[in-house]
Amino acid sequence: MNIDVVLLLQQNPILLIFVVLAIGLAFGKVRIANMQLGNSIGVLITSLIMGHLGFSFNAEALTIGFMLFIYCVGIEAGPNFFGIFFRDGKHYFTLSMVVLVTAVSISYFASHYMGLDFGLSAGMMAGALTATPVLVGAQDALNSGLATIPRNMEFSLVLENLSVGYAMAYLVGLISMIMFAKLLPRLQKQNLSDSAQQIAQERGLGGSGQRKVYLPIIRAYRVGPELINWTDGKNLRELGIYRQTGCYIERIRRHGILAHPDGDAILQEGDEIALVGFPDSHARLDPSFRNGKEVFDRNLLDLRIVEEEIVVKSDAIAGKRLSDLNLSEYGCFLNRVIRAQIEMPMDLDIVLAKGDILQVSGEKSRVHGLAERIGFISIHSQIADLLAFCSFFILGIMFGLVTMTFGQVSFSLGNAVGLLLSGITLGFLRANHPTFGYVPQGALNMVKDLGLMIFMVGIGLSAGGKMFEHLTQVGPQIIGIAFLVSVVPVFFAYLVGAYVLKMNRALLFGAIIGARTCAPAMDIVNEYAKSTIPALGYAGTYAIANILMTLAGTILIILS
């Protein structure tokens, strides 16, 4: 049996999509100079080659790809967006606006000066900023009629220009941002590591702001004469065992009766006590604990230690510092703090926001008691609330179709903005109502990444046919403008953040990278800072920048 592979792929668009995805994802794992190409570049290059070979793509599949992507971006941003915007928005919003206003200005004036065709400037800016939301906003403005296409151009040609501009500028944007992350920390006067340590000292952090994560252990001891002498008649509150060592007494057996002690309890000779703490905490116990006979009793040691992710929801807790939680009162241990999927430094002075996730371990009843106070335990379920997911998706599309009229001017927000807003709403409601709209993070990541990759396949296949033709005609101009769009806004943001906003350099670099939504550069800055402190700045600008970039794409294509 003979199989014509080319004909098979041309007649089966779904098969073509996944063939390009599989080859592109495999290609993305290739490393060049210790840097992995990544999924986006792998899929983009593969689809460009396939497009150049004459393969085409279904435009409807391209549309569903970007819709799913932008909707999931909104859901991820929702839990933290309003808190960041209204509480810490001054610096983060300013930096995001500096980056985008500068990028839009350079793209608009440079493309007009160079005489680039309609659509190339928006695609080029999206690629230079490595920001797919810019491209999504521009394309949706065309689909909704918000942007007017020149009379001498076909709609398909404009979409092709968007794709070509994006594809040609993407590598320029990614490489230049990574170079910025490597070079600018060296060129500035302040050492990034020193800046991170300064924040660490001001906020009570130690070292890198990281710690190993492991569950506490339980050990039991019989109270002997040495320990009685050490306690000197003081109650547990006065002894401050937790403050000194990080261990706390979970149970006491006295005269055969098990009990949970309170702060007023006084140890007596012959008591058997169960202590909970990390291994290094047990090692800090006074020798009079360990010199007593260690007890191996199933009933005494039968404690259920759990590790849960607690989502901050309470209005009384949001806006307070981590130190205000007084975890020692609950006998709980904090392992990590996660905001916008970014692990934060273990900073006792970090201000909590709704939607923050605290990974806490301890005895089950104590952890659940803490969760009732600050929010709720994240549902560890593999079942997504598809009804809410689909309903808000529909609402987003419907909202984007609403036409508003001002005098003789009519316009609609379009699918991109509508889905972004509905996604933010769903994410926000999910952060405040644990049983509503739950989507496992793994499932959300898969839908978002799949939508983005399908969108990238469409971009590459659409651009591939004309890619080399454009390279010979306007390639140098697009690459030159893309370099300016990628680099100049970053330097402006650095100057504004450093000398106008007076931001700490470690936080500033994280915030700039968040404004550029360039995750690969984040690891480089953390490495230079020898800390995860820059992640505080990254999380602050990331949610805001994703929203503004979608609007920037819409604005630029309208102005072009």
Curated annotation (Swiss-Prot):
Domain RCK C-terminal, first and last residues per copy: 203-292, 293-376
Highest rank taxon of the organism: Bacteria
GO cellular component: plasma membrane
One Pfam family matching this protein: TrkA_C
Cellular location(s): Cell membrane
Membrane topology per record: Multi-pass membrane protein
Keyword Glycosyltransferase: no
Residues annotated as transmembrane: 5-25, 37-57, 66-86, 91-111, 164-184, 386-406, 409-429, 443-463, 478-498, 506-526, 539-559
This protein's UniProt keywords: Cell membrane, Membrane, Repeat, Transmembrane, Transmembrane helix, Transport
InterPro entries referenced in this protein's UniProt entry, alphabetically: AAE_transporter, RCK_C, RCK_C_sf, Transp_YbjL_put, YidE_YbjL
A biological process from GO: potassium ion transport
GO function term, MF aspect, one: monoatomic cation transmembrane transporter activity
PANTHER family to which the protein is assigned, alphabetical: K(+)_H(+) ANTIPORTER SUBUNIT KHTT, TRANSPORT PROTEIN YBJL-RELATED
UniProt family annotation: Belongs to the AAE transporter (TC 2.A.81) family. YbjL subfamily.
Stored NCBIfam families: PRK04972.1 (NF003440), YidE_YbjL_dupl (TIGR01625)
Protein name: Putative transport protein VV1438
